[in-house]
Amino acid sequence: MHYFSEKPTTKSDVKIVEDILRGKKLKFKTDSGVFSYGKVDKGTKILVENVVVDKDDDILDLGCGYGVIGIALADEVKSTTMADINRRAIKLAKENIKLNNLDNYDIRVVHSDLYENVKDRKYNKIITNPPIRAGKEVLHRIIEEGKELLKDNGEIWVVIQTKQGAKSLAKYMKDVFGNVETVTIKGGYRVLKSKKL
C-alpha cells in the first residue's frame, strides 16, 4: 500500500511533528499511510525554503500530503490550493490548516488524482514533491498537464532526489517548457523550475 493510494489500509497512528519553515514555527498532524510520516521530508523542506512566491500568487501544492508546502506558504500568497489523491492526507491537511491558525487565509484542500479536480482555475505557481515511486509516466503527466494550468509566466517547481532521475526530469521539463533552471542542489536533492513563456 503506497502513500499515493486513494485509501490507505494501514492502521491510523497520528503523530504531531513541529518544524521551522521559512522562519515560521509550524505543527503538523501526520499519520501512517501518508507520505513523510513522523517528520517533515528533507526534499520538501529544501523545496519550501527555496521556492519564490509573490503576494499576488495563486499557488497549487500538488500531492500535498498532510500539507507542509501549502501551509508554509499560505500567508505569503493570494490563494492556496492543496491537492492529493490520498483521503487520509486530505483530512490531515484540513486539520493542519486549523492547527496553524490559517483559517482566515484563502486555502482550499481538494481530493484529486493529479490535476483532475483542480482545473477550475489557473495558477502562478505549481509546487510539488512528486511521488517518484508512482513512476515516470506520472512524473511526465505532472509536468505536461501542469503547463496547461499555469498562467502566462507561471512556474512549476519540483524537488527530486538527484539519484532518482533529476537530470532526466530536467531534460523533460526543458522539452515541455523550452526552459529549465536548477535552483539549488542540496543534500542529494535538486529543486528544478520551469517557466511558461
UniProtKB/Swiss-Prot annotation:
Pfam family, any one: MTS
Family to which the UniProt record says this protein belongs: Belongs to the methyltransferase superfamily.
Binding site for substrate: N129, P130, P131, I132
EC number, as in UniProt: 2.1.1.-
Protein name per the record: Probable S-adenosylmethionine-dependent methyltransferase MJ0882
InterPro entries hit by this protein: RsmC/RlmG, SAM-dependent_MTases_sf, Small_mtfrase_dom
Job of this protein: Probable methyltransferase that uses S-adenosylmethionine as the methyl donor. Binds neither NAD nor NADP in vitro.
Name of the top EC class for this enzyme: transferase
Residues binding S-adenosyl-L-methionine: G63, C64, G65, Y66, G67, D84, N129
Alphabetized GO MF terms: rRNA (guanine-N2-)-methyltransferase activity
Biological-process GO terms, alphabetical: rRNA base methylation
Origin: domain of life: Archaea
Keywords: Methyltransferase, S-adenosyl-L-methionine, Transferase
Species name: Methanocaldococcus jannaschii (strain ATCC 43067 / DSM 2661 / JAL-1 / JCM 10045 / NBRC 100440)
